[in-house]
């Protein structure tokens, strides 16, 4: 799997205002900004992202995904710091 493929999968299941994915083909790091994270705690946000991946995690197609999840307001604050 490539970073572009993983981005496409996440975007297909989650409305993202910003998304970056980097990695080596098995271990991935993503920064995801979505209004769908509003009012949700970290674990709920991660579950939303994992839901977009479906069985790709279980089948080891995506071995590991580290992520930072932000609402648009949180992202704007992070950029202004």
What is each of the regions a protein language model found here?
Residues 51-81:
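C-terminal structural segments of small proteins and small subunits
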Residues 13-29:
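Short edge beta-strands and adjacent turn/loop segments
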Residues 26, 35-37, 72:
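Residue-level signature for short turns and capping positions that connect secondary-structure elements
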Residues 1-16:
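N-proximal, solvent-exposed amphipathic alpha-helical segments enriched in charged/polar residues
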Residues 6, 10, 45-60:
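Short, non-transmembrane amphipathic alpha-helical segments
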């Amino acid at each position: 799997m490539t970073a572009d493929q993983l981005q496409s999968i996440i975007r297909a299941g989650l409305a993202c205002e910003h998304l970056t994915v980097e990695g080596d083909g098995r271990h991935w790091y993503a920064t995801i900004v979505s209004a769908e994270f509003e009012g949700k705690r970290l674990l709920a946000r991660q579950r939303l992202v994992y839901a977009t991946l479906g069985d790709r995690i279980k089948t080891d197609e995506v071995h590991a995904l580290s992520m930072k999840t932000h609402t648009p307001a949180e992202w704007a604050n992070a950029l202004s710091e």
